[in-house]
Swiss-Prot record:
Keyword Endoplasmic reticulum applies: no
Protein name as it appears in the record: Auxin-responsive protein IAA20
Main location: nucleus
Ubl conjugation recorded as keyword: no
UniProt keyword terms in alphabetical order: Auxin signaling pathway, Nucleus, Repressor, Transcription, Transcription regulation
Length: 183
């Protein structure tokens, strides 16, 4: 087994054994070289003389030769990943249209996700939230308070926090980013 793989612990001798004779010449050269002469290859050596587009780059994003408004300034650089696919799909589909939103309840460390596209009204949303986060508060009071004992707020597309029910359902479903349940 040791001879088939060409593995051994001793330093290589000037006359290689038949098992190591099948090894590539470059590997033998590395083994027989003087200590300290082995080094890692540089970037240019590893690429084998391959020239990249940004070899003349001076780090300022315009290219090498210092032309600020020259040839390189007029060329338009292609952005990788542009346009963002997620935004493109949203625009094509006509907005968010009630996809998944994150739902967090005050006092709980773990949130959940809710698909707004299967819901059609605020009443369905509140019932679903009540099933997702059951309340232990069994106070007597108003019928709505007993049925939904917490306030629900949402963050819209502009980053403002608003109370659920302030805008029509369609506008809410298109603008909501996340929901927060306040106890």
């Amino acid at each position: 087994m040791e001879l088939e793989l060409g593995l051994r612990l001793a330093l290589p001798s000037p006359s290689p054994s038949p098992a190591t004779a099948t090894a590539a010449g470059s590997e033998l050269d590395l083994l027989n070289s003087a200590p300290g002469s082995c080094r890692k290859r540089g970037f240019e050596e590893a690429l084998g003389g391959f020239k990249t587009d940004d070899d003349n780059d001076d780090g300022n994003g315009r290219g090498g030769d210092g032309d600020s408004d020259g040839e390189m300034g007029n060329k338009r650089r292609k952005l990788v990943g542009w346009p963002p696919v997620k935004c493109l799909h949203r625009r094509r589909d006509g907005g968010c249209g009630g996809g998944y939103v994150k739902v967090k309840m005050e006092g709980l460390a773990i949130g959940r996700k809710l698909d707004l596209s299967i819901l059609g009204s605020y009443a369905e949303l509140l019932d679903t939230l009540h099933l997702m986060f059951p309340s232990t508060n069994q106070e007597d009071g108003h019928d709505r308070r007993r049925r939904h004992p917490y306030a629900v707020t949402y963050e819209d597309g502009e980053g403002d926090w608003m109370q659920v029910g302030d805008v029509p359902w369609e506008a809410f479903a298109k603008s909501v980013k996340r929901l927060k349940i306040l106890v």
